[in-house]
Amino acid sequence: MRPDGIAGFALTIAAPAKINLALHVVGQRADGHHLLESLVTFAECGDGIGLAAAEADHFTVSGRFAPDLSPSAENTSGNLVLRARDVLRRELASQGRAAGPVHLHLEKNLPVASGIGGGSADAAATLRGLLSLWGASLEPARLGSLALELGADVPMCLDGRPLIARGIGEEITSIPDLPSFAIVLVNPLVEVSTPVVFRLLIRKSNPPLVLPENLRSTAAWLAALASMRNDLEPPARALEPMIEAVSTALEDAGATLVRMSGSGATCFGLFADEKSASLAAETISASQPRWYVRATRTAGKSG
C-alpha cells in the first residue's frame, strides 16, 4: 500500500499481513471447530482499505492480486469487507446511530488464500475505518464480538500487534516484548484450502504452545520459536508439494528460522537484519520470478 494512502479516498486503513510464527492445534470442539494456540505477529506489508462517503454503497478493487479474487468478491456473502460493513451498520442502526452509504476500495496486495490473513485483516481494517468515517465507537469487547462473527482470525487483526491467540482465535493475550524481526514472505502462488488442510490433520490434540518466561533477547526468542511448530504444515505439504520448495528456497537463502504461516502456502524466513532479508528476497525472486516474495519487518519491540 502506498504510504500516502489510496488516491481519491478520504481515509486509508492498512490491513497488515498476519504471520503465525507458531500454530499449535490442541483440540477440537464438539461443533467441529479446532482449538488453537498461536503466536502471531504482523508485517509492515499488506492490503489497504480506502473509505469515502458516497451517495450509494460502492465497492471497487485494485492491486496485483485483484484479478485472483473470486466473482463472489463483489457479493456481500462472499466478501469479508462488505460483510464487515453490513455487520457494523446493523449494530449501529440497532443503537439508532447513522451509518451512511460508503465507497469501499480494497487494494489487494497479498496473495489470495495464502495463510497470512489477508481477508481477515481486510475485514478488521474495514471495521476500524468505518468507525472512524462514521464518527462512531464501540466498546472493545463488543467490537471483538462483531469481528468474531466475521471469522475466527478477524479479532486478532483489529490491533495489528503481537499476541497469542487461543480457543478458536478469540482468546487474545498481547505479547508486548516480542521483538521485531527482519522477515521474508514467500508464496508460490498456489491457493491452499484451509478446510482441506484441517481435514488432512491426523492428530487433533497436540502439545500446547509453551512460551518461556524472561525472554529478553532476540536470540532467546529465536531459540523459543525453534522449539515451536505449525501443526498444519505437514498436511499442507502433503496437499501442496510446492510448500517444500518454498521452505528450501528460504533455507538456502540463509534464513535462521523457516516455517509455514497459517494453513499455507506462504512460508516465512527470519533473518539477522534487513540487508540479509533484502538480499535473500532478491535471490529468491531471481530464481522464481513468478512467486510472491517480499522482504519486510514484523511488528514488535525494536532493539
Swiss-Prot record:
Entry keyword set: ATP-binding, Isoprene biosynthesis, Kinase, Nucleotide-binding, Transferase
Binding-site positions, ATP: P111, V112, A113, S114, G115, I116, G117, G118, G119, S120, A121
Catalysed reactions listed for this entry: 4-CDP-2-C-methyl-D-erythritol + ATP = 4-CDP-2-C-methyl-D-erythritol 2-phosphate + ADP + H(+)
Pathway recorded for this protein: Isoprenoid biosynthesis; isopentenyl diphosphate biosynthesis via DXP pathway; isopentenyl diphosphate from 1-deoxy-D-xylulose 5-phosphate: step 3/6
Gene3D superfamilies: 3.30.230.10, GHMP kinase, C-terminal domain (3.30.70.890)
Molecular functions (GO terms): 4-(cytidine 5'-diphospho)-2-C-methyl-D-erythritol kinase activity; ATP binding
Catalytic site: K18, D153
InterPro entries registered for this protein in UniProt: GHMP_kinase_C_dom, GHMP_kinase_C_sf, GHMP_kinase_N_dom, IspE, Ribosomal_Su5_D2-typ_SF, Ribsml_uS5_D2-typ_fold_subgr
EC number(s) stated in the UniProt entry for this protein: 2.7.1.148
Name of the top EC class for this enzyme: transferase
GO terms under biological process: isopentenyl diphosphate biosynthetic process, methylerythritol 4-phosphate pathway; terpenoid biosynthetic process
SUPFAM superfamilies, alphabetized: GHMP Kinase, C-terminal domain, Ribosomal protein S5 domain 2-like
NCBIfam families, per database record: ispE (TIGR00154), PRK14608.1 (NF011202)
Role played: Catalyzes the phosphorylation of the position 2 hydroxy group of 4-diphosphocytidyl-2C-methyl-D-erythritol.
UniProt similarity note: Belongs to the GHMP kinase family. IspE subfamily.
UniProt-recorded name of the protein: 4-diphosphocytidyl-2-C-methyl-D-erythritol kinase
